[in-house]
Amino acid sequence: TLYEEYENKNMGMKTINARDVWFKILDSQSETGVPYLLYKDACNKKSNQKNLGTIKSSNLCCEIVEYSDDNETAVCNLASIALSKFVKTPSIPFKHLDNIKIYTKNNCNWCLMMKNELKKNNISYKEEKVEVEDFESFKKQHDVETVPQLYDGDDLIGGYSKVAELLKPVFDYDELHKITKIVTNNLNKVIDINFYPTVKTKTSNMRNRPIGIGVQGLADTFALMNIPFHSEQAAIVNKQIFETMYHAALEKSMEIAKIEGPYNSFNGSPASQGILQFDMWNEKVSNDRYDWDKLKDEIKENGIRNSLLLAPMPTASTSQILGNNECFEPFTSNIYVRRTIAGEFIIINKHLLQELINIGLWNEETKQQMVKY
């Protein structure tokens, strides 16, 4: 290799312990996310294209790892889905919508937050403020310790936490499944009608038919659902989102293959043997939400039209167009400068901003505190 050649010629400036370099790389990755490293053996072991030969590279952003050789140049056909669009308002759990009453008091942030929850769900209410001198008698009369308290007719529902839980937005997995199948179908059509700059790119795309479906706005989704990004609940929702997308993409690709046949290099691939991505990662997936065993049998019988399906890309520019946070990343900061090929923009966490406005806490002091920290 060139490295060994330079080493033999004593062209190096100095010698550094390899382990020290490795630890520096790991420190940098954990603190900054760079340098980008891919592990060749792991990439090939977990690829549905490993029957084609050894995969030697990825694209710049590392969301796709595809086979290339002297006769074909890998291409991928990408689209991202805005996850925030699948957050839906729950069905209203109250029985007496014409008789919702809340008890509040002055200088109570929890009271403001409860009113905000009701406002977001278009629920009208009557507010009664409890004066300081009446607070002890109020607690005894209603058998509560704090305000706010919400009544649905004559039924005590509870305080802010209870109401927030009842009105918590839900994620529409069925709609995501439907949209992912549409995107899969559309990207598959792009392969056939696309313009190819070289013969080798067309050869690769027609032979392997890879597509890459990614996401944007995962952080927005968690914000809309009032789920902390680092929480166990967020991990569950994240897993269910990608399980839904992977199942939908596989199912649609299989349905297309029933009509048009599997992609040319399907035979010998892991999918042709009923081995899917989670199998190559030694992950067990239950059939609670989707019947994976049935889908595997259908894929072995009919094939799939596309060798690759999901590819969570950075969405640095497209997420700005739709007003979402990038891909599956957490919010970088509540206020920051974003630079894209289109220019430089000041980005603010719009969900936090709206919450602060709704509860009356958006003011100059708050803004300066956000900028400071």
Regions found by a protein language model. Name each.
Residues 112, 116, 136, 165:
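Alpha-helical elements of the RecA-like P-loop NTPase motor core of helicases
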Residues 33, 96-128:
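Local sequence-structure signature of Cys/Sec-based thiol-disulfide redox active-site neighborhoods
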Residues 127-145, 163:
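Thioredoxin-like thiol-disulfide oxidoreductase module
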Residues 1-97, 120, 168-373:
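Long, C-terminal-biased catalytic regions of enzyme "large/alpha" subunits
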Residues 152-169:
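Non-catalytic, surface beta->alpha helical segment in thiol-disulfide oxidoreductase systems
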Residues 83, 113-116, 155:
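Short Cys/His-rich local motifs and their 1-3 flanking residues in nucleic-acid-associated proteins
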